[in-house]
């Protein structure tokens, strides 16, 4: 017994050490793809080289980068906007303890402080590929069956990094221009230094325009990126809903708030998606069937989570409660008579289903009204058949006719009026007149992507510009916003391997543990900022009667559609570049 106890302590200690190690330093996986050999690297001239690159390119780790040498980069920005740039460092000799430093950006006596600038080594993760027929859905249990490679994606929080000979290391720079900055041309210097190299400098110039971007909390675009608090507890090996858990959740969720996240993801049943992710969702609400056959409900965890998101994080939109139609139609409860967890197995439309849910929903509505949350709470479903949706809606209406109902799934005319929020898949048709009618009633109409789409997507092998293109498409299509099913459902080894047993690599997360951002998340943020810029400019042009400018904007925006992409005249990167240039010139 004593040996077992000691072993348990040692094992727990090892797990804690592993979690800490993954946060500070780790080795990237080996890329087995063909790459430039020593004979190519020996021809690069100077043994260590540095240049500005493009944010649209994922530079390969073991190839000499194809870049046009540039030591000066010019960017334009609105006040309050975050802009980013990518530099590239490559070397044919080992470098130790390489560091990045970016000082203040100055324009005369005006300053954008260094505290508004962040620099990151871009790290490489393992990815895979699309299915043979396109898309990324389906099981991938055997990783050897898929063409895998290393790709640049994660933005590290490490302060220094060793760089091996014959390798490339991208560097990401982000500047969050203060909302009260003075318009003008600012200049700063990125310095890269380390053992085995002389300090090297790149100049960044930021032309701050006399326009101001709203704060993220005020963006009109409706954003719903599903959160998974259970993944955070597992990765860091901390008890669910403990102080340690919430402390670790806080910076992850703050990243969401900083891109204008609206919705809070809440799970109101055990395994709403049948444990499809590495870390399944538990129910945030306890259910107990008492000895006398009546029910009692424990909202402690639900209340903690919602209060944390609203008050600590500042995400205060729809509380999306999943789900009444899970993948496996088994509904858990604690049975006081047997002192065991039991399950009700019932389909929508059956009496047992109605009894289980009506009783709960009535009490849930009571609790939500007491908390003052009823008006912002929805009972949410995703990708469920029409007949099941009809049956679930009938149960919800019986319990409380005022409950909001949401669906991320196919367009069904028959239930439109019942859906406060509806997100349909990219490429599906949502009639413009229906969207307009829903808007008049205060209903929300959005678009979503998942593993299905070959384009646009945010897999770790997707072109970076696709992440920016996607929310802009939502605005171009007349939608109110964008939904994506997962932002932090981490894999078993998320810092090094983005592949998963189901779906294409990177589908389950774009924020890494740490938390660390990614090229994909930063580009998504770029697109979301553009959406708010478009709204502000449209309002201004309409109020001033600037028809010419409005038409120019709408003409470029109209390209961000499936039809526009099919024409094949521009890549997603070219379209985003064209729009950015226009938004900064109008």
Task: Tell what function each PLM region has.
Residues 1-22:
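Bacterial Sec-dependent N-terminal signal peptides
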Residues 19-274, 374, 568-586:
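Mature N-terminal, pre-catalytic/accessory segment of carbohydrate-active enzymes
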Residues 79, 182, 247-248, 300-301, ...:
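Short, glycine/acidic-rich beta->alpha junctions
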Residues 146-147, 161, 176, 187-194, ...:
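Aromatic-lined carbohydrate-binding surfaces of glycoside hydrolases
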Residues 320, 404-406, 446:
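Structural detector of well-ordered beta-strand residues that form the stable sheet scaffold
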Residues 330-333, 341, 345-411, 479, ...:
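Catalytic domains of carbohydrate-active enzymes that cleave complex glycans
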Residues 406-429:
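Aromatic- and acid-rich polysaccharide-binding/catalytic face
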Residues 421-503:
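Catalytic-core region of carbohydrate-active enzymes that cleave or remodel glycosidic bonds
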């Amino acid at each position: 017994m004593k040996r077992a106890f000691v072993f348990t302590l040692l094992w727990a200690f090892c797990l804690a050490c592993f979690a800490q190690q993954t946060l500070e330093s780790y080795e990237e996986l080996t890329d087995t793809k063909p790459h430039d050999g020593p004979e190519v690297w020996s021809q690069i001239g100077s043994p260590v080289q540095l240049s500005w690159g493009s944010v649209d390119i994922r530079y390969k780790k073991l190839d000499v980068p194809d870049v046009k040498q540039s030591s000066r980069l010019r960017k334009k920005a609105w006040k309050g906007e975050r802009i980013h740039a990518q530099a590239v460092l490559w070397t044919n000799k080992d470098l130790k303890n390489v560091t990045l430093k970016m000082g203040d950006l100055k324009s005369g006596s005006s300053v954008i402080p260094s505290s508004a600038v962040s620099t990151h080594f871009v790290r490489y993760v393992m990815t895979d590929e699309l299915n043979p027929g396109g898309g990324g859905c389906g099981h991938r249990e055997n990783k050897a069956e898929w063409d895998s490679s290393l790709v640049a994606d994660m933005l590290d929080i490490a302060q220094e990094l060793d760089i091996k000979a014959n390798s490339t290391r991208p560097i990401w720079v982000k500047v969050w221009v203060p909302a009260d900055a003075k318009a003008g041309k600012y200049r700063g210097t990125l310095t890269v230094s380390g053992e085995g190299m002389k300090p090297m400098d790149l100049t960044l110039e930021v032309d701050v325009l006399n326009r101001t971007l709203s704060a993220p909390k005020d963006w009109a675009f409706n954003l719903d990126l599903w959160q998974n608090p259970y993944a955070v507890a597992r990765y860091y090996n901390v008890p669910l809903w403990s102080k340690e858990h919430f402390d670790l959740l806080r910076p992850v969720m703050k990243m969401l708030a900083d891109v204008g996240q609206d919705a809070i993801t809440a799970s109101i049943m055990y395994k709403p998606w049948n444990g499809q992710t590495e870390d399944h969702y538990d129910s945030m609400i306890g259910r107990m069937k008492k000895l006398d056959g009546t029910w009692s409900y424990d909202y402690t965890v639900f209340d903690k989570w919602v209060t944390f998101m609203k008050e600590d994080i500042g995400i205060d939109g729809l509380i999306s409660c999943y789900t009444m139609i899970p993948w496996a139609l088994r509904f858990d409860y604690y049975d006081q008579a047997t002192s065991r967890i039991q399950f009700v197995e019932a389909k929508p439309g059956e009496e047992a289903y109605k009894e289980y849910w009506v009783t709960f929903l009535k009490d849930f509505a009571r609790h939500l009204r007491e908390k003052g949350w009823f008006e912002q709470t929805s009972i949410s479903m995703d990708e469920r058949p029409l007949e099941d949706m009809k049956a679930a809606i009938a149960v919800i209406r019986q319990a409380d006719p005022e409950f909001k109902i949401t669906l991320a799934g196919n367009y069904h005319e028959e239930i439109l009026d019942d859906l406060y929020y509806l997100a349909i898949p990219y490429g599906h048709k949502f009639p413009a007149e229906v969207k307009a009618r829903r808007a008049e009633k205060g209903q929300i109409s959005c678009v979503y992507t998942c593993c299905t789409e070959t384009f646009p997507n945010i897999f770790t092998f997707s072109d970076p510009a696709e992440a920016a293109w996607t929310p802009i498409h939502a605005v171009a299509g007349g939608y109110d916003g964008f939904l994506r099913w997962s932002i932090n459902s981490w894999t078993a080894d998320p810092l090094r391997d983005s592949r998963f047993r189901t779906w294409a690599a990177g589908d389950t997360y774009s924020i890494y543990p740490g938390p660390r951002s990614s090229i994909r998340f930063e580009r998504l943020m770029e697109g979301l900022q553009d959406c708010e810029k478009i709204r502000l400019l449209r309002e201004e042009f309409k109020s001033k009667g600037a028809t010419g400018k409005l038409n120019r904007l709408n003409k470029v925006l109209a390209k961000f559609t499936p039809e526009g992409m099919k024409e094949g005249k521009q890549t997603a990167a070219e379209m985003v570049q064209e729009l950015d240039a226009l938004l900064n010139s109008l």
